[in-house]
Regions:
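Glycine- and acidic-residue-biased ligand/ion/polar-headgroup-sensing regions
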Residues: 49, 60-71, 76-77
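A short, N-terminal "cap"/entry segment at the start of jelly-roll beta-barrel domains
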Residues: 1-39, 132-165
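A contiguous, mid-protein "functional segment" used to position or interact
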Residues: 103-150
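Conserved short histidine dyad/triad with adjacent acidic residue
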Residues: 29, 41-57
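Conserved strand-loop elements at the edges of beta-sheets that form or border functional pockets
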Residues: 47, 57, 65, 84, ...
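Short acidic-glycine-tyrosine-enriched beta hairpin
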Residues: 11, 35, 70, 77-95
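Short strand-coil-strand connectors
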Residues: 23, 74-76, 101
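Ligand-binding loop in jelly-roll beta-barrel domains
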Residues: 36, 72, 92-117
């Protein structure tokens, strides 16, 4: 990480930024790491009902701030519910997953240092609208996802949460 050579100020409105359809969700990169010298990136995510990633870890710290909807979260052996205004913080290497229990959920996700935005770009496709992706939106194959996870330091440890978990 450089020291102050690529710093700028960034201001975006809700829903404004670089948009990606990422594995059934909408990811809007609101503050790219390049704008803040890689210190962090900030992404707005829109999730559909019952969205749940596999239990996983990241090589960066991840903090969720729920704006809309309800999430059931399992992290470091604990289970909790996040509602609007709720925050979940997952240090690098801490296993976590979640499930969207509302019709949709929207959250701001902070990656410290920058890193998660690369995952959205590599596994996503450019979004043509600020909505959830259409059902026929291409998704990476299981082999492609493994390659992307390896390249970005993400580690899958277990299954996603089911509707009844």
């Amino acid at each position: 990480m450089a020291t102050g050579s690529n710093l700028t100020a960034v201001a975006t409105a809700l829903g404004e930024g670089e948009r990606w359809w990422f594995v059934g969700t909408l990811a809007i990169i609101r503050v790219p790491g390049a704008a803040v010298d890689g210190r962090f990136d900030l992404t707005e995510l829109l999730f559909p009902h019952h969205a749940s990633p596999p239990l996983h870890t990241h090589p960066v710290d991840e903090t969720f701030v729920v704006l809309e909807g309800h999430l059931t979260v399992v992290a470091a052996g604990h289970r909790f519910v996040l509602q609007p205004g709720g925050i979940g913080a997952f240090p690098a290497g801490v296993a976590h997953t979640f499930r969207v229990d509302s019709d949709t959920a929207r959250a701001l996700v902070l990656s410290t240092p920058s890193g998660l935005e690369r995952l959205y770009r590599e596994a996503g496709v450019p979004a043509t609208a600020p909505t959830l992706p259409p059902p026929d939106t291409p998704r990476p194959s299981a082999d492609e996802m493994r390659r992307i996870f390896d390249a970005t330091g993400q580690v899958n440890l277990g299954p996603p949460l089911g509707a009844d978990d």
